[in-house]
Amino acid sequence: MSLFNDKVAKLLAGHEALLMRKNEPVEEGNGVITRYRYPVLTAAHTPVFWRYDLNEETNPFLMERIGMNATLNAGAIKWDGKYLMLVRVEGADRKSFFAVAESPNGIDNFRFWEYPVTLPEDVVPATNVYDMRLTAHEDGWIYGIFCAERHDDNAPIGDLSSATATAGIARTKDLKNWERLPDLKTKSQQRNVVLHPEFVDGKYALYTRPQDGFIDTGSGGGIGWALIDDITHAEVGEEKIIDKRYYHTIKEVKNGEGPHPIKTPQGWLHLAHGVRNCAAGLRYVLYMYMTSLDDPTRLIASPAGYFMAPVGEERIGDVSNVLFSNGWIADDDGKVFIYYASSDTRMHVATSTIERLVDYCLHTPQDGFSSSASVEILKNLIERNLRLMK
């Protein structure tokens, strides 16, 4: 075997060892979720044959030809008994694309499919696409709604940073062949749009996040709700805010729906992200809330504070101090797999159950919106516990 082939064999063996590494739970926790020791996907998990030209004649030094920078913000779905993430893969060139990775158990051994997703273009091509939410809708299609980013051509000459965000829509029956639908038409920019899994009053329902600019929400008040007559020509008319932003909370700057909600006997379980500003920049955390089965716009539970925040190495990455989730899977036995990205760099999994998540939502105190209210809530728990401890 030649030296070149030896190097290729070593690359492939190292990659296979990474993919086969067994993940293990981190036991210490808060009783709500279980974290796992290793990320489930990193840039190093992408196939060797995506990154290297394995032909000695055209790549005699075995150099990496196409660099991969990050794997993040993945949608998720259970498909043919496998746990699938539709991953945002970011190349070294900063362009993102979508690729499917599958696992037999949802915890480890995630492998990318051979090819990334070939996503048809809209009439107006996007420069970048990312953060797809997957919804298996009752109409029989699997929908993917994602952010389609384009340069803001109304920006001053020489401004190469200003951009616009719209919600791109695509659908599939097999996660391989995709039909591109027209982008969502709205009065404002949109970059966190999620399709509700069921019809509501015979219409498609969307969770939205209206915002004035590409980054800043401005007058956008929180997570919105809109009904759509025709998903193939989707347009938001009336839009109402169902989960508001509040001053001095974990969602004072902006918030956005994560994956589509999970239906439970007690209500719809929602996972969302909240953003606040601090000396280190924008801090992204995850939080939960519940809405009514009879009226998905009616809030029935809103626990105070964050559900998950970055810890340990999760704090470090391309965009530090960030957790983001747009994918989870609920198994028939009630186990829930929460897929989340840390610091725009890598993908992790945490597990819980429907029962625990509902208990967390219904029995965690709501935000009192002041220090004195927080103290009173804390005193109430202390008093009850002290009586039990006597």
Swiss-Prot record:
| InterPro entries linked | Glyco_hydro_beta-prop_sf, Man_Glc_phosphorylase, Mannoside_phosphorylase
Q: How does activity depend on temperature?
A: Optimum temperature is 50 degrees Celsius.
Q: How does activity depend on pH?
A: Optimum pH is 7.
Catalytic reaction equation(s): 4-O-beta-D-mannopyranosyl-D-glucopyranose + phosphate = alpha-D-mannose 1-phosphate + D-glucose
Which key words tag this protein in UniProt? Carbohydrate metabolism, Cell wall biogenesis/degradation, Glycosyltransferase, Transferase
Supply the enzyme class, top level.
transferase
Protein EC: 2.4.1.281
Describe the family membership recorded for this protein in Swiss-Prot or TrEMBL: Belongs to the glycosyl hydrolase 130 family.
Q: Which HAMAP family match?
A: Man_Glc_phosphorylase (MF_00928)
Function description: Converts 4-O-beta-D-mannopyranosyl-D-glucopyranose (Man-Glc) to mannose 1-phosphate (Man1P) and glucose. Involved in a mannan catabolic pathway which feeds into glycolysis.
The protein's name is: 4-O-beta-D-mannosyl-D-glucose phosphorylase
* UniProt lineage: Bacteria, Pseudomonadati, Bacteroidota, Bacteroidia, Bacteroidales
